[in-house]
Amino acid sequence: MIRTLIIATASAAALFSTPAVTQERSQGTASIPDLSGIWGNPYLYGIEPPLSGPGPVVNKARRRQAFDVDGRPLPAANAPFVSDARQLVGDYTNPILMPAAAEVVKKHAELSLAGVGYPSPRNQCWPQGVPFIFTNDAVQLLQQPDKITMLYDEDHEVRRVRMNQPHPAQVTPSWYGDSVGHYEGDTLVIDTVGFKIGPFSAVDQYGTPFTQALRVVERYRLIDHEAATKAWERGAKENARGGGGIGETWAPDPSYKGKALELQFTVEDKGVFTTAWSATKTYRRVSRDWPENVCAENPHKYGTEKDATVPIAGRPDF
C-alpha cells in the first residue's frame, strides 16, 4: 500500500460532546444517533470531492482504461473509470495549494509516473494521522457518554475523542491530534488540532504537506440507502480500484438497504492551503469479520508494485 510525506502539528480551539447510543439529550428531545459498528468503503481511498466549492487534491491518473487478466482493454462501458493502482498522480494545479505545497505534490506525481515508489506513513508503517487515516477502507465506532473510540482496519490504529470538552490551553502534539466533539442534532462533530510532525506525515496519499496550523473538522451522520448509493457512484468514478473494483473484504452486502454513514470533513491550514476545503466519504455497514492487518508483517504490497524502490517495513521500528 502507499503513504506520503509532509509536516504536522497544530493548536486551536474546538467543541464536542457524546452520548450513549439510545440515550436522550437533556437539551431537546432528539436522541443520540446510533453510529456504532463497523463501517466500510471498498473503493481505493474512497474520498469524494464536494459537489461544489474547494475540494481535495485528486488523482489525475484515476481515469485510465481498464484491462482484463490477459491484458486486453475492457469496453469503456464496462469500466470507464478504473485507476492504475500503482499510480498516484496528485493534481498539483488544484488552486487550494500554495506554490510550495503544489511543488511537493508535483514532485511526488513525477516519481509515481516514473514508476518509483516514495515513502508515506502507510508504506513505512508509521501512524497515518488525520485526515490521511480517512483513506482506510473501514472504521469501527464505539460510542460512550464521555468519549468516542475510532478503530481503523489498518495496523490497529486508534483515535480517542473526548466529548463535550474544550481543547487544552496548550495542546501536546500527537500523531492523531487532540480531538474533542459534540452532537448537533443527528450529527456527530469532531474538531481536531495539535498534530505531531513526522518524517512521512502528509494530508493525503499524494504527499500534500501540512503545518502546525492544520485543523480538521469531521461531521458524521446517517443517510438513507438511496443517498448513499448516489455517493458511492460518485466515489467509484473517483476511486475505483485498478482491475475493476471493489475490495472483497469491505464489499457491501447487496441485500442491505439500511442506513449508511456519511463523513463530511473540512481541512484548513494557512501554511499550506489558500482556503479551507472539504470532502466526503460514505460508508455502509460491514457484517464480515474484522481481519487483522499488521503493517510490520508486510502482508501485501501496494497494488502489484513488486519492484517498488521504497520497501515496506520488514519488522517493527519499536
Task: Outline where the language-model segments fall.
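PEST-like low-complexity, intrinsically disordered acidic/proline/serine-rich tracts
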Residues: 2, 9, 21-318
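Hydrophobic helical h-region of N-terminal Sec-dependent signal peptides
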Residues: 7-15
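N-terminal signal peptide c-region/cleavage motif recognized by signal peptidases
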Residues: 17-19
